[in-house]
């Protein structure tokens, strides 16, 4: 819970009783008026999804968890650089804004995140935000321009991130139906973790 930002993130545990979740939701509505709440849970748990749908919550696509399990390929990564001062402005201009972890928040938490860039002809053409402070570090975002994607710079970003992350483990969560994205991570050495899909739902609590 981040009171100053009126934001709540909740990973919902196991429950098969809709009444139990409805009671918890009522508690949050009474005590956190005006907050935006993101909930992550098993997409097949109707005891949780049912009450949220009735309240008009916004459902994101189902997510597939992938874990690095195999060696990454040996490819050229000369175009990949860590974020440094000359590239900050371009990185911020390119970065997704419809997310909690905006470029500005990433920059203010560099003890928690590593940022790698695709640099070609003096221009930032892609970036990867990944955790750096855990035994299993999560990739938060990978973005490429169309040109960088066609050149295969996404795989180069992943290979370099994996090298810098050693000896720690790495994971990522992608849309379950994103075939091209899943293929990219598979090529880098990731495999799907079956039975661990999740879904994120955003619910704006009335003030």
Question: Where do the protein language model's features map onto the residues?
Answer:
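Conserved active-site tyrosine of GNAT-family acetyltransferases
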Residues: 50-53, 184-186, 190
